[in-house]
Protein backbone atom coordinates (compact mmCIF):
# COMPACT_ATOMS: atom_id res chain seq x y z
CA UNK A 1 0.00 0.00 0.00
CA UNK A 2 1.27 3.47 -0.99
CA UNK A 3 -0.25 5.33 1.95
CA UNK A 4 -0.47 9.12 1.83
CA UNK A 5 1.12 10.54 4.97
CA UNK A 6 1.30 14.26 4.24
CA UNK A 7 -0.11 16.88 1.89
CA UNK A 8 1.18 20.42 1.52
CA UNK A 9 -0.55 23.03 -0.61
CA UNK A 10 0.99 26.37 -1.48
CA UNK A 11 0.37 29.47 -3.57
CA UNK A 12 2.78 29.83 -6.51
CA UNK A 13 2.72 31.93 -9.69
CA UNK A 14 1.74 30.90 -13.21
CA UNK A 15 3.19 32.11 -16.50
CA UNK A 16 1.13 35.31 -16.40
CA UNK A 17 2.23 36.23 -12.89
CA UNK A 18 -1.09 35.18 -11.37
CA UNK A 19 -1.35 32.89 -8.34
CA UNK A 20 -2.16 29.22 -8.73
CA UNK A 21 -2.19 26.15 -6.49
CA UNK A 22 0.73 23.76 -6.14
CA UNK A 23 0.56 20.60 -4.06
CA UNK A 24 3.10 18.15 -2.63
CA UNK A 25 1.93 14.65 -1.67
CA UNK A 26 4.23 12.55 0.52
CA UNK A 27 3.89 8.77 0.73
CA UNK A 28 4.83 6.45 3.57
CA UNK A 29 7.88 5.27 1.61
CA UNK A 30 9.28 8.80 1.50
CA UNK A 31 8.37 9.31 -2.16
CA UNK A 32 6.91 12.71 -3.04
CA UNK A 33 4.75 13.89 -5.94
CA UNK A 34 4.32 17.54 -6.90
CA UNK A 35 1.85 19.22 -9.24
CA UNK A 36 0.72 22.74 -10.12
CA UNK A 37 -2.54 23.62 -11.86
CA UNK A 38 -3.02 25.90 -14.88
CA UNK A 39 -5.57 28.67 -15.43
CA UNK A 40 -7.43 29.97 -18.48
CA UNK A 41 -8.03 33.47 -19.89
CA UNK A 42 -11.06 32.67 -22.05
CA UNK A 43 -13.17 30.24 -20.05
CA UNK A 44 -16.36 28.36 -20.75
CA UNK A 45 -19.29 29.31 -18.52
CA UNK A 46 -19.78 25.67 -17.53
CA UNK A 47 -16.23 24.92 -16.39
CA UNK A 48 -15.59 23.67 -12.87
CA UNK A 49 -15.05 26.63 -10.56
CA UNK A 50 -11.54 27.89 -9.96
CA UNK A 51 -11.50 29.32 -6.44
CA UNK A 52 -10.01 32.82 -6.10
CA UNK A 53 -9.84 34.87 -2.89
CA UNK A 54 -11.41 38.03 -4.28
CA UNK A 55 -9.29 40.20 -1.96
CA UNK A 56 -8.30 43.30 -3.99
CA UNK A 57 -5.36 43.90 -1.65
CA UNK A 58 -3.59 40.76 -2.90
CA UNK A 59 -2.88 39.99 -6.56
CA UNK A 60 -5.85 42.13 -7.68
CA UNK A 61 -8.22 39.66 -6.08
CA UNK A 62 -6.69 36.63 -7.80
CA UNK A 63 -5.02 35.06 -4.78
CA UNK A 64 -5.67 31.38 -4.06
CA UNK A 65 -5.06 31.20 -0.31
CA UNK A 66 -8.59 29.87 0.30
CA UNK A 67 -8.00 27.01 -2.12
CA UNK A 68 -4.61 26.33 -0.53
CA UNK A 69 -6.24 26.28 2.90
CA UNK A 70 -8.72 23.69 1.64
CA UNK A 71 -5.80 21.52 0.48
CA UNK A 72 -4.02 21.81 3.82
CA UNK A 73 -7.06 21.22 6.03
CA UNK A 74 -10.25 19.58 4.80
CA UNK A 75 -8.81 17.76 1.80
CA UNK A 76 -5.74 16.64 3.71
CA UNK A 77 -7.85 15.22 6.53
CA UNK A 78 -9.98 13.29 4.03
CA UNK A 79 -7.17 11.66 2.06
CA UNK A 80 -4.43 11.02 4.62
CA UNK A 81 -3.96 7.27 4.91
CA UNK A 82 -5.50 6.52 1.51
CA UNK A 83 -3.64 4.41 -1.03
CA UNK A 84 -2.14 6.70 -3.68
CA UNK A 85 -2.36 3.93 -6.27
CA UNK A 86 -6.17 3.98 -6.01
CA UNK A 87 -6.62 7.10 -8.17
CA UNK A 88 -10.30 6.58 -8.94
CA UNK A 89 -11.19 6.09 -5.27
CA UNK A 90 -9.16 9.11 -4.24
CA UNK A 91 -10.78 11.32 -6.87
CA UNK A 92 -14.25 10.12 -5.84
CA UNK A 93 -13.35 11.01 -2.27
CA UNK A 94 -12.51 14.54 -3.40
CA UNK A 95 -15.70 14.83 -5.46
CA UNK A 96 -17.90 13.58 -2.60
CA UNK A 97 -16.12 15.86 -0.13
CA UNK A 98 -16.82 18.90 -2.31
CA UNK A 99 -20.43 17.90 -2.82
CA UNK A 100 -21.23 20.34 -5.63
CA UNK A 101 -21.67 19.75 -9.35
CA UNK A 102 -19.15 22.43 -10.35
CA UNK A 103 -16.64 21.98 -7.50
CA UNK A 104 -17.41 25.42 -6.16
CA UNK A 105 -17.09 24.57 -2.46
CA UNK A 106 -13.47 23.40 -2.39
CA UNK A 107 -12.40 24.76 -5.77
CA UNK A 108 -11.42 22.75 -8.82
CA UNK A 109 -7.91 24.20 -8.55
CA UNK A 110 -7.50 22.76 -5.04
CA UNK A 111 -8.91 19.37 -6.01
CA UNK A 112 -6.92 19.05 -9.23
CA UNK A 113 -3.62 19.92 -7.55
CA UNK A 114 -4.14 17.02 -5.15
CA UNK A 115 -5.37 14.63 -7.85
CA UNK A 116 -2.33 15.30 -10.05
CA UNK A 117 0.19 15.22 -7.20
CA UNK A 118 -1.16 11.87 -5.98
CA UNK A 119 -0.73 10.37 -9.46
CA UNK A 120 2.84 11.65 -9.65
CA UNK A 121 3.66 10.22 -6.22
CA UNK A 122 2.13 6.84 -7.12
CA UNK A 123 4.05 6.73 -10.40
CA UNK A 124 7.30 7.50 -8.57
CA UNK A 125 6.50 4.84 -5.99
CA UNK A 126 5.93 2.26 -8.73
CA UNK A 127 9.18 3.13 -10.48
CA UNK A 128 7.36 4.05 -13.70
CA UNK A 129 7.34 7.26 -15.74
CA UNK A 130 4.01 9.03 -15.35
CA UNK A 131 2.78 8.29 -18.89
CA UNK A 132 3.41 4.56 -18.39
CA UNK A 133 1.80 4.57 -14.95
CA UNK A 134 -1.31 6.27 -16.32
CA UNK A 135 -1.70 4.22 -19.48
CA UNK A 136 0.19 0.95 -19.17
CA UNK A 137 2.34 -0.80 -21.76
CA UNK A 138 0.08 0.23 -24.65
CA UNK A 139 0.93 3.91 -24.24
CA UNK A 140 3.25 4.37 -27.22
CA UNK A 141 1.71 7.11 -29.34
CA UNK A 142 3.20 10.60 -29.33
CA UNK A 143 0.73 13.41 -30.03
CA UNK A 144 0.70 15.59 -33.13
CA UNK A 145 1.37 19.13 -31.84
CA UNK A 146 -0.96 21.98 -32.75
CA UNK A 147 1.35 24.97 -32.41
CA UNK A 148 -0.15 28.39 -31.82
CA UNK A 149 2.06 30.78 -33.80
CA UNK A 150 -0.28 33.79 -34.14
CA UNK A 151 -2.43 34.91 -31.21
CA UNK A 152 -5.59 37.00 -31.25
CA UNK A 153 -8.74 37.42 -29.19
CA UNK A 154 -8.34 37.22 -25.42
CA UNK A 155 -4.71 36.13 -25.82
CA UNK A 156 -3.41 39.24 -27.58
CA UNK A 157 -3.77 42.99 -27.93
CA UNK A 158 -4.55 43.23 -31.63
CA UNK A 159 -7.62 43.40 -33.87
CA UNK A 160 -7.85 39.66 -34.57
CA UNK A 161 -11.01 38.09 -33.17
CA UNK A 162 -9.91 34.47 -33.59
CA UNK A 163 -7.81 33.38 -30.65
CA UNK A 164 -5.29 30.99 -32.19
CA UNK A 165 -3.79 30.37 -35.62
CA UNK A 166 -1.92 27.06 -35.45
CA UNK A 167 0.52 25.04 -37.52
CA UNK A 168 0.18 21.24 -37.46
CA UNK A 169 3.13 19.15 -38.74
CA UNK A 170 1.04 16.26 -40.08
CA UNK A 171 3.73 15.05 -42.49
CA UNK A 172 6.57 14.66 -40.00
CA UNK A 173 7.99 11.14 -39.50
CA UNK A 174 8.22 11.44 -35.70
CA UNK A 175 7.66 13.89 -32.87
CA UNK A 176 11.24 15.13 -32.80
CA UNK A 177 11.05 16.16 -36.45
CA UNK A 178 7.56 17.62 -35.95
CA UNK A 179 8.97 19.87 -33.24
CA UNK A 180 11.88 20.91 -35.46
CA UNK A 181 9.56 21.73 -38.34
CA UNK A 182 7.41 23.85 -36.05
CA UNK A 183 10.39 25.71 -34.62
CA UNK A 184 11.74 26.48 -38.08
CA UNK A 185 8.39 27.84 -39.25
CA UNK A 186 8.13 29.89 -36.04
CA UNK A 187 11.49 31.54 -36.70
CA UNK A 188 10.66 32.09 -40.37
CA UNK A 189 7.42 33.77 -39.31
CA UNK A 190 9.28 35.97 -36.85
CA UNK A 191 11.57 37.22 -39.63
CA UNK A 192 8.64 37.90 -41.96
CA UNK A 193 6.77 39.86 -39.28
CA UNK A 194 9.93 41.80 -38.38
CA UNK A 195 10.66 42.64 -42.01
CA UNK A 196 7.12 44.02 -42.33
CA UNK A 197 7.89 46.42 -39.50
CA UNK A 198 5.52 44.78 -37.04
CA UNK A 199 6.17 43.80 -33.43
CA UNK A 200 7.56 40.33 -32.75
CA UNK A 201 6.50 40.38 -29.11
CA UNK A 202 4.70 37.19 -28.09
CA UNK A 203 1.39 36.61 -26.32
CA UNK A 204 0.38 34.45 -23.37
CA UNK A 205 0.94 31.21 -25.28
CA UNK A 206 4.14 32.22 -27.04
CA UNK A 207 2.70 33.13 -30.43
CA UNK A 208 3.13 36.42 -32.22
CA UNK A 209 0.40 39.05 -32.13
CA UNK A 210 0.90 41.19 -35.25
CA UNK A 211 -1.56 43.92 -36.18
CA UNK A 212 -2.73 42.67 -39.57
CA UNK A 213 -5.63 43.87 -41.71
CA UNK A 214 -7.84 40.81 -41.25
CA UNK A 215 -7.90 37.11 -40.44
CA UNK A 216 -6.95 35.93 -43.92
CA UNK A 217 -3.89 38.17 -43.77
CA UNK A 218 -2.79 36.26 -40.65
CA UNK A 219 -3.33 32.95 -42.45
CA UNK A 220 -1.32 34.15 -45.44
CA UNK A 221 1.58 35.18 -43.17
CA UNK A 222 1.71 31.64 -41.79
CA UNK A 223 1.58 30.07 -45.25
CA UNK A 224 4.42 32.36 -46.32
CA UNK A 225 6.45 31.25 -43.29
CA UNK A 226 5.84 27.56 -44.04
CA UNK A 227 7.15 28.05 -47.57
CA UNK A 228 10.10 30.17 -46.37
CA UNK A 229 11.08 27.40 -43.95
CA UNK A 230 11.18 24.92 -46.84
CA UNK A 231 7.98 23.00 -46.18
CA UNK A 232 4.81 22.30 -48.14
CA UNK A 233 1.63 23.83 -46.74
CA UNK A 234 -1.09 21.22 -46.50
CA UNK A 235 0.97 18.15 -47.32
CA UNK A 236 3.62 18.58 -44.62
CA UNK A 237 2.24 21.30 -42.37
CA UNK A 238 -1.50 21.98 -42.09
CA UNK A 239 -3.36 24.76 -40.31
CA UNK A 240 -5.73 24.87 -37.36
CA UNK A 241 -7.91 27.65 -35.93
CA UNK A 242 -9.24 28.25 -32.44
CA UNK A 243 -12.05 30.71 -33.04
CA UNK A 244 -13.13 30.99 -29.38
CA UNK A 245 -16.36 32.25 -30.92
CA UNK A 246 -18.07 32.75 -27.55
CA UNK A 247 -15.76 35.72 -27.08
CA UNK A 248 -17.13 37.66 -30.08
CA UNK A 249 -20.77 36.58 -29.99
CA UNK A 250 -23.07 39.52 -29.22
CA UNK A 251 -26.87 39.58 -29.25
CA UNK A 252 -27.14 36.56 -31.52
CA UNK A 253 -24.52 37.74 -34.00
CA UNK A 254 -20.83 37.03 -34.58
CA UNK A 255 -19.16 40.46 -34.47
CA UNK A 256 -15.76 40.49 -36.15
CA UNK A 257 -13.79 43.62 -35.31
CA UNK A 258 -10.89 42.21 -37.32
CA UNK A 259 -13.12 42.31 -40.40
CA UNK A 260 -14.13 45.95 -40.01
CA UNK A 261 -16.85 45.32 -37.42
CA UNK A 262 -18.68 42.82 -39.61
CA UNK A 263 -21.83 41.44 -37.96
CA UNK A 264 -22.74 37.97 -39.16
CA UNK A 265 -25.62 35.61 -38.48
CA UNK A 266 -24.70 32.01 -37.70
CA UNK A 267 -25.23 30.87 -41.34
CA UNK A 268 -23.14 33.77 -42.64
CA UNK A 269 -20.33 33.04 -40.17
CA UNK A 270 -20.42 29.36 -41.14
CA UNK A 271 -20.19 30.39 -44.80
CA UNK A 272 -17.03 32.35 -43.98
CA UNK A 273 -15.46 29.39 -42.15
CA UNK A 274 -16.39 27.03 -44.99
CA UNK A 275 -14.83 29.40 -47.52
CA UNK A 276 -11.58 29.44 -45.53
CA UNK A 277 -11.58 25.63 -45.36
CA UNK A 278 -11.95 25.46 -49.14
CA UNK A 279 -9.27 28.09 -49.73
CA UNK A 280 -6.61 27.15 -47.17
CA UNK A 281 -5.20 23.85 -45.75
CA UNK A 282 -7.23 24.09 -42.54
CA UNK A 283 -7.87 20.72 -40.91
CA UNK A 284 -9.09 21.70 -37.42
CA UNK A 285 -11.49 24.38 -36.16
CA UNK A 286 -12.02 24.78 -32.42
CA UNK A 287 -15.04 26.49 -30.86
CA UNK A 288 -16.33 27.65 -34.22
CA UNK A 289 -19.63 28.71 -32.64
CA UNK A 290 -20.75 30.23 -29.33
CA UNK A 291 -21.04 27.57 -26.62
CA UNK A 292 -24.79 28.17 -26.31
CA UNK A 293 -25.56 28.43 -30.03
CA UNK A 294 -26.87 24.90 -30.42
CA UNK A 295 -28.52 25.57 -33.77
CA UNK A 296 -25.30 27.14 -35.04
CA UNK A 297 -23.27 24.17 -33.87
CA UNK A 298 -25.66 21.78 -35.62
CA UNK A 299 -25.40 23.76 -38.85
CA UNK A 300 -21.61 23.95 -38.64
CA UNK A 301 -21.38 20.23 -37.92
CA UNK A 302 -23.66 19.31 -40.82
CA UNK A 303 -21.63 21.52 -43.12
CA UNK A 304 -18.06 20.64 -42.13
CA UNK A 305 -17.85 17.61 -39.84
CA UNK A 306 -16.86 15.32 -42.73
CA UNK A 307 -14.22 17.77 -43.98
CA UNK A 308 -12.37 18.99 -40.89
CA UNK A 309 -11.97 18.33 -37.21
CA UNK A 310 -14.52 20.38 -35.24
CA UNK A 311 -13.30 20.69 -31.67
CA UNK A 312 -15.56 21.54 -28.74
CA UNK A 313 -13.83 23.39 -25.91
CA UNK A 314 -16.27 25.82 -24.27
CA UNK A 315 -18.96 23.57 -25.75
CA UNK A 316 -17.96 20.49 -23.73
CA UNK A 317 -15.56 21.77 -21.00
CA UNK A 318 -14.12 18.24 -20.52
CA UNK A 319 -17.47 17.19 -19.05
CA UNK A 320 -18.88 13.75 -19.92
CA UNK A 321 -22.49 14.87 -19.48
CA UNK A 322 -22.08 17.71 -21.97
CA UNK A 323 -20.01 15.55 -24.30
CA UNK A 324 -22.71 12.86 -24.35
CA UNK A 325 -25.28 15.50 -25.28
CA UNK A 326 -23.06 16.58 -28.17
CA UNK A 327 -22.56 13.00 -29.32
CA UNK A 328 -26.31 12.37 -29.23
CA UNK A 329 -26.96 15.51 -31.29
CA UNK A 330 -24.03 14.87 -33.68
CA UNK A 331 -22.47 18.19 -32.71
CA UNK A 332 -18.73 18.59 -33.41
CA UNK A 333 -16.48 15.54 -33.81
CA UNK A 334 -13.71 16.25 -31.30
CA UNK A 335 -13.28 17.39 -27.70
CA UNK A 336 -10.61 19.60 -26.20
CA UNK A 337 -9.33 18.17 -22.93
CA UNK A 338 -8.34 20.67 -20.23
CA UNK A 339 -7.74 19.05 -16.89
CA UNK A 340 -8.68 22.12 -14.85
CA UNK A 341 -12.07 22.40 -16.57
CA UNK A 342 -13.25 19.31 -14.71
CA UNK A 343 -10.95 19.09 -11.67
CA UNK A 344 -9.76 15.47 -11.34
CA UNK A 345 -7.72 13.06 -13.43
CA UNK A 346 -10.36 10.34 -13.25
CA UNK A 347 -13.01 12.58 -14.78
CA UNK A 348 -10.50 13.73 -17.40
CA UNK A 349 -9.80 10.14 -18.45
CA UNK A 350 -13.53 9.39 -18.56
CA UNK A 351 -14.06 12.23 -21.05
CA UNK A 352 -11.21 10.99 -23.25
CA UNK A 353 -12.56 7.43 -23.21
CA UNK A 354 -16.11 8.54 -24.00
CA UNK A 355 -14.84 10.56 -26.96
CA UNK A 356 -12.89 7.63 -28.33
CA UNK A 357 -15.84 5.24 -28.04
CA UNK A 358 -17.99 7.69 -30.02
CA UNK A 359 -15.42 8.15 -32.77
CA UNK A 360 -14.53 11.64 -31.58
CA UNK A 361 -10.92 12.72 -31.33
CA UNK A 362 -9.48 14.10 -28.08
CA UNK A 363 -7.01 16.99 -28.05
CA UNK A 364 -5.05 17.40 -24.82
CA UNK A 365 -4.62 21.09 -24.05
CA UNK A 366 -2.73 23.56 -21.92
CA UNK A 367 -4.23 26.83 -20.63
CA UNK A 368 -3.05 30.37 -21.28
CA UNK A 369 -1.83 30.56 -17.68
CA UNK A 370 0.63 27.67 -17.36
CA UNK A 371 3.45 26.50 -15.09
CA UNK A 372 6.49 24.29 -15.49
CA UNK A 373 4.26 21.29 -14.69
CA UNK A 374 4.33 18.80 -17.61
CA UNK A 375 1.51 16.48 -16.60
CA UNK A 376 -0.47 17.10 -19.81
CA UNK A 377 2.44 15.76 -21.90
CA UNK A 378 2.29 12.48 -19.98
CA UNK A 379 -1.51 12.39 -20.23
CA UNK A 380 -1.31 12.82 -24.01
CA UNK A 381 0.93 9.76 -24.35
CA UNK A 382 -0.64 7.80 -21.50
CA UNK A 383 -4.06 7.96 -23.16
CA UNK A 384 -2.78 7.67 -26.77
CA UNK A 385 -4.79 10.82 -27.45
CA UNK A 386 -2.91 11.56 -30.66
CA UNK A 387 -3.02 15.37 -30.45
CA UNK A 388 -1.80 18.09 -28.10
CA UNK A 389 -2.17 21.86 -27.92
CA UNK A 390 0.51 23.39 -25.75
CA UNK A 391 1.40 26.69 -27.30
CA UNK A 392 4.05 28.11 -29.55
CA UNK A 393 7.79 27.58 -29.86
CA UNK A 394 8.73 30.11 -27.20
CA UNK A 395 8.23 30.64 -23.44
CA UNK A 396 9.61 27.98 -21.15
CA UNK A 397 6.15 27.16 -19.76
CA UNK A 398 5.21 25.90 -23.26
CA UNK A 399 8.57 24.43 -24.23
CA UNK A 400 8.61 22.39 -21.00
CA UNK A 401 5.79 20.22 -22.38
CA UNK A 402 7.48 19.77 -25.76
CA UNK A 403 10.75 18.82 -24.08
CA UNK A 404 8.95 16.27 -21.92
CA UNK A 405 7.46 14.72 -25.06
CA UNK A 406 10.95 14.52 -26.57
CA UNK A 407 12.10 12.62 -23.47
CA UNK A 408 9.11 10.28 -23.65
CA UNK A 409 9.78 9.56 -27.34
CA UNK A 410 13.40 8.78 -26.47
CA UNK A 411 12.28 6.54 -23.60
CA UNK A 412 9.90 4.62 -25.88
CA UNK A 413 12.59 4.09 -28.49
CA UNK A 414 11.60 1.97 -31.48
CA UNK A 415 8.05 1.35 -30.27
CA UNK A 416 7.23 5.08 -30.32
CA UNK A 417 4.55 6.01 -32.86
CA UNK A 418 3.73 9.36 -34.44
CA UNK A 419 0.30 9.31 -36.11
CA UNK A 420 0.66 12.43 -38.25
CA UNK A 421 -2.37 12.99 -40.49
CA UNK A 422 -3.98 9.77 -39.24
CA UNK A 423 -4.68 11.52 -35.92
CA UNK A 424 -7.28 13.60 -37.75
CA UNK A 425 -9.95 11.05 -38.60
CA UNK A 426 -12.45 13.40 -40.17
CA UNK A 427 -10.46 14.78 -43.09
CA UNK A 428 -12.05 14.54 -46.52
Curated annotation (Swiss-Prot):
* Names of the cofactor(s): Mg(2+)
Q: What is its EC number?
A: 4.2.1.11
Q: Which UniProt keywords apply?
A: Cytoplasm, Glycolysis, Lyase, Magnesium, Metal-binding, Secreted
For this protein, what reaction is catalysed?
(2R)-2-phosphoglycerate = phosphoenolpyruvate + H2O
Q: Which Pfam families match?
A: Enolase_C, Enolase_N
Which Gene Ontology MF annotations are present? magnesium ion binding; phosphopyruvate hydratase activity
How is this protein annotated for GO cellular component?
cell surface; extracellular region; phosphopyruvate hydratase complex
What InterPro entries would the database entry show? Enolase, Enolase-like_C_sf, Enolase-like_N, Enolase_C, Enolase_CS, Enolase_N
Determine if Manganese is one of this entry's keywords: no
State the family named in the UniProt similarity comment for this chain: Belongs to the enolase family.
Database matches in HAMAP family: Enolase
This protein's name? Enolase
Source species, please? Verminephrobacter eiseniae (strain EF01-2)
Amino acid sequence: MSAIVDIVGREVLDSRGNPTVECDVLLESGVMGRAAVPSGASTGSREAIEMRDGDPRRYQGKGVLKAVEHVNTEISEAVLGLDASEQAFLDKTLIDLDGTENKSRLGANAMLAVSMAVARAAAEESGLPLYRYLGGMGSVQLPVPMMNVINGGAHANNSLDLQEFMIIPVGAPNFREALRWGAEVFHALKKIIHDLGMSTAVGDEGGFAPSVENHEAAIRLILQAITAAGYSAGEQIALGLDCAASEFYQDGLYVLHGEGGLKLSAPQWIDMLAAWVDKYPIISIEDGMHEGDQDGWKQLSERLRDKVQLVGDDLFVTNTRLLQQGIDQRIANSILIKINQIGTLTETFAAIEMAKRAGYTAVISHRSGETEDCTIADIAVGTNAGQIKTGSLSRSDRIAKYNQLLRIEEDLGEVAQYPGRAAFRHLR
